[in-house]
Design a protein with these regions (language model features):
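Catalytic alpha/large subunits of respiratory electron-transfer oxidoreductases
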Residues: 1-221
Length: 221
C-alpha cells in the first residue's frame, strides 16, 4: 500500500489528484492523508497548463445573485451557455434590464451568433493564442481614455475602444474569465490584464469556475 511506497520510494513519490467535484470534506481528507505520509503533492487543478505561485483562490469575484443586476460584463474564454448555464441565465436576466455584454472568445466558444441565447454588444473572435493580445488592446484603449500608462503593448482599435467604453460606463460591472481562460497556456497574463482593466474601470474580476466545488477544494487543500 501507500506505506510500502513511502518506505521504498520516499514520500515525494506519492501524489493525489482530487476532483474539483469533490466535497470540501473529501478534499481536506485527501490532503490530510498525503501530508500524514509526508507528501504535499495534492492538487485539484486537473486541466491547468500554467500554475502561478501565490495566485490565491480563484472565485467568481462577486456574488452569484449580483450577476442578475450587472450593467456591464466582459466574458473571456467561455462557452457561457454550455459551460455555465446558471451563470448564463443570471447574465441573460441582466441583459433584459439593459446590461451590455462583451466577449473575447474563439469560434468554438461562440459556435453561432446566438450560441449564448443573449445579445452580445461587442465581440472579439480570436483563437485562444490571441486572447492576451485582445485584452492588451482593451487595456490600451482604457489607458488612452483615462490618460494613464497601459500595462502592456496593445492597439486601441475600434473593437477594443468599444469594449473599453462599455466597461468605463455603468456602475455594476464584471470581467469574467471562463474555463478556457483558466486552462490557457498564458492564464497568468490573462489574469494580470483582466485585473488591471478591472482596477481602472471599477469592474470586479473573477473566474466562472469549472466544476461543482472548484472554490471549495482550493480552500480545503
Amino acid at each position: 500500500g501507500l506505506k510500502n511506497i513511502q518506505r521504498d520510494h520516499g514520500a515525494a513519490s506519492i501524489g493525489a489528484l482530487v476532483s474539483p467535484h469533490s466535497t470540501v470534506e473529501e478534499a481536506y481528507l485527501a490532503g490530510a492523508l498525503l501530508r500524514g505520509l509526508g507528501s504535499d503533492n495534492v492538487d485539484a487543478r486537473l486541466r491547468r497548463a500554467e500554475f502561478v505561485a501565490g495566485e490565491g483562490v480563484q472565485w467568481l469575484g462577486t456574488s452569484i445573485a449580483s450577476l442578475s443586476s450587472l450593467q456591464r460584463v466582459l466574458v473571456v474564454g467561455s462557452n457561457l451557455r454550455k459551460d455555465h448555464p446558471l451563470f448564463a441565465l443570471r447574465i441573460r436576466q441582466a441583459t433584459r434590464q439593459g446590461a451590455q455584454v462583451s466577449a473575447i472568445v474563439g469560434r468554438r466558444e461562440l459556435a453561432s451568433g446566438n450560441a449564448w441565447a443573449l445579445p452580445l454588444t461587442h465581440t472579439v473572435l480570436s483563437d485562444a493564442s490571441g486572447w492576451a493580445q485582445a485584452l492588451a488592446d482593451v487595456a490600451a484603449a482604457v489607458a488612452a481614455a483615462k490618460g494613464v500608462a497601459a500595462p502592456a503593448a496593445g492597439q486601441a482599435n475600434a473593437q477594443a475602444q468599444a469594449i473599453a467604453q462599455s466597461l468605463l460606463s455603468g456602475e455594476r460591472k464584471a470581467i469574467l474569465l471562463g474555463n478556457a481562460a483558466a486552462h490557457h497556456a498564458n492564464a497568468s497574463s490573462l489574469l494580470v490584464l483582466a485585473n488591471w482593466i478591472g482596477e481602472q474601470t471599477g469592474a470586479s474580476v473573477g473566474y466562472l469556475t469549472e466544476a461543482a466545488n472548484t472554490v471549495g477544494v482550493q480552500w480545503a487543500k
